[in-house]
Design a protein with these regions (language model features):
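General beta-strand structural signal in soluble alpha/beta enzymes
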Residues: 95-99, 138, 158-161
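Aromatic-anchored, charged helix-turn/loop surface patch used as a conserved interaction hotspot
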Residues: 99-135
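N-terminal, charge-rich interaction modules
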Residues: 52-111, 197-198
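Helix-rich interaction surfaces within compact, conserved domain-sized segments
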Residues: 67, 124-130, 141-198
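Short, Lys/Arg-enriched N-terminal segments with co-localized hydrophobic residues
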Residues: 40-52
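Gly/Ser/Thr-rich loops at beta-strand to alpha-helix junctions
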Residues: 74-77, 103-104, 113-115, 139-144, ...
Length: 198
């Protein structure tokens, strides 16, 4: 093994508390660098301590058959660009869109072609209050009709889910704000398919 690694046969690995380590520690103590490093590390730990975090479950309110897309973006122009994408991809599309700002006035911005869906999307977005998240509710159409187009909107960073299932959103809340950490899309598995199920 030592020949393979090209390690001299008389090589001895340093052990914890060896004289070399002790000399280095003495040197650090003598010039104060050891204490400075510990102080800096302690200060960094205090600065990075964001305080407590709570995880909440927010249930999306919607009629059973209504489809939704829940995502994360990065710019206020999200509302305008997703709106344009929807009307250009599916002529006559009925949808409501809402987006949570994460800076400035931190308002819920909204748009759409169906007043009821806009109101419902706005209500759900405000319940989430997760910075830069958006929710798109659509009627008489499916996410598959628009999902790739929505993904290609420059402001869109990711999609959490696209579904008609009941959705629960796991939201982390700190003193600073809220963020989506995951979703529960529908129900847990009840078994494994058999030949009869195929």
């Amino acid at each position: 093994m030592s020949a393979f690694l090209n390690i001299p046969a008389n090589f001895t690995s340093p052990k914890a508390g060896s004289s070399g380590e002790k000399e280095a520690e003495k040197s650090e103590e003598a010039d104060g660098t050891g204490e400075q490093a510990r102080t800096a590390e302690s200060a960094m730990t205090e600065e990075n301590d964001g305080g407590d975090m709570d995880i909440k479950t927010v249930k999306i309110e919607k009629p059973e058959a209504l489809n939704l897309i829940l995502g994360h973006s990065h710019f206020i122009k999200t509302v305008e660009d997703i709106y344009e994408t929807m009307v250009n991809t599916v002529p006559g599309a009925k949808f409501g869109l809402a987006f949570c700002e994460s800076s400035g006035p931190c308002l819920v911005r909204y748009s759409g072609t169906d007043d009821d869906l806009v109101e419902l999307a706005t209500k759900n977005a405000y319940a989430l209050s997760a910075g830069h998240s958006f929710i798109l509710l659509m009627k008489d159409m499916f996410p598959i009709n628009v999902l790739n187009a929505v993904k290609n909107v420059p402001e869109v960073c990711r999609i959490f889910c696209a579904t008609a299932n009941p959705v629960e959103v796991l939201v982390a809340e700190t003193e600073q704000g809220r963020g989506i950490i995951g979703v529960i899309d529908g129900f847990k598995s009840k078994g494994i398919e058999s030949e009869a199920d195929i």
